Amino acid sequence: MYDNTDNNGTVRCSFCGKTQEEVKKIVAGPGVYICNECIDLCKEIIDEEFYDEAVRELTDVPKPQEILNVLNEYVIGQERAKRTLSVAVYNHYKRVNQSETAATQDDVELQKSNICLIGPTGSGKTFLAQTLAKTLNVPFAIADATSLTEAGYVGEDVENILLKLLQSADYNVERAEKGIIYIDEIDKIARKSENVSITRDVSGEGVQQALLKILEGTVASVPPQGGRKHPHQEFIQIDTTNVLFIVGGAFDGIETIVKNRLGEKTIGFGKTNSALNEEESIMQHIIPEDLLKFGLIPEFIGRLPVMAALDKLTNDDLVRILTEPKNALVKQYQKLLSLDDTKLEFEPEALKAIAAKAIERNTGARGLRSIIEEIMMDVMFDVPSDESIEKVIITKMAAEGTGKPTIIYNKKDKEAV
């Protein structure tokens, strides 16, 4: 460590010895000085250690049951899909750790198992992927397949998906290479028919072809500023071998393909589609051949070996979603009003009415918040300005839009409806 001052009284950095004139700023402590350059260096060292810790965290991958337990706290229903995802994610990161610690060339190389989620809008596909990434503390990015086009056409390149993941990892490449990418609306890039078309399909089969390499694992050149607008920028190299890709889509109409296939195979045994277990969704019987008939190319399907079907949420499921998860919507709005010292209660019939509205609008769980916002708008406007409001009760009539919430006052001996 350098002396703080010399014979001329010049202040020096205690770490690098530079004078006040040689640096931008020197910060004084009890008998110690440090310059801005040494502060920056210390920050870099600390950041690197934190990044190393974040990368090392994955060596202790939660078991499938532990992953399922976390999913159960946040996601209602979809039991089969949650179990499938728990096993697939555990196996993926076990494979990542094995590839890093493989000692000899005789070790069996484990192939990557990307995941395809099939289910209607609002059934929880995106939320499941987000919860998995949060549970594992890995970078997470969402992309929309409908915005992607082949290189050379107007639209987003597939490399832009990796840019979003890199940004989520604060541009730490090593962390990004162990992240999760969720590609939504994957069914929208299906071929229009099984037959190969001679016309160019720049947002369909062409995008599937463009995605093949990064799904399988390749070293991709990612433009840090977004590609086409900055053609002369330096590229960042990202290896996608250990990136877990989860794709999702509603696949409207695929149930007809499944029914036709099951019907053809059961006729010889005197069974019909109605002989299937009524409690089981037809979607649970999807196989890769059905995706092929829907319009995904064989090479693309081959890179999505794990398939999980999500059922359409029922009225009871939506009521549970409103109240049971850790961050349930009802709990969120109760918390909001509690900040204004006001209690909030939803009558059971009101919850059923809210769920019925979501089903009527065909929005699933995704539409629940907007419905509650409509119901709560006047309440959330009035409560902050009226300290006499003690409690708000959301009734069935209020939920249906035929009445107003019940207001209970603490100072005025009355009840307004």
From Swiss-Prot:
Family annotation (Gene3D superfamilies): 1.10.8.60, ClpX chaperone, C4-type zinc finger domain, P-loop containing nucleotide triphosphate hydrolases
Domain of life: Bacteria
InterPro entries named in the record: AAA+_ATPase, ATP-dep_Clp_protease_ClpX, ATPase_AAA_core, Clp_ATPase_C, Clp_protease_ATP-bd_su_ClpX, ClpX_bact, P-loop_NTPase, Znf_CppX_C4
Binding residue positions for ATP: 120-127
Pfam families: AAA_2, ClpB_D2-small, zf-C4_ClpX
Positions annotated to bind Zn(2+): 13, 16, 35, 38
PROSITE patterns: CLPX_ZB
GO molecular function: ATP binding; ATP hydrolysis activity; ATP-dependent protein folding chaperone; protein dimerization activity; unfolded protein binding; zinc ion binding
Protein's GO biological process: cell division; proteolysis involved in protein catabolic process
PANTHER family: ATP-DEPENDENT CLP PROTEASE ATP-BINDING SUBUNIT CLPX-LIKE, MITOCHONDRIAL (PTHR48102:SF7), ATP-DEPENDENT CLP PROTEASE ATP-BINDING SUBUNIT CLPX-LIKE, MITOCHONDRIAL-RELATED (PTHR48102)
Oligomer status and interactors: Component of the ClpX-ClpP complex. Forms a hexameric ring that, in the presence of ATP, binds to fourteen ClpP subunits assembled into a disk-like structure with a central cavity, resembling the structure of eukaryotic proteasomes.
Family: Belongs to the ClpX chaperone family.
Protein name: ATP-dependent Clp protease ATP-binding subunit ClpX
Organism, scientific name: Enterococcus faecalis (strain ATCC 700802 / V583)
Upper classification of the organism: Bacteria, Bacillati, Bacillota, Bacilli, Lactobacillales
Gene label: clpX
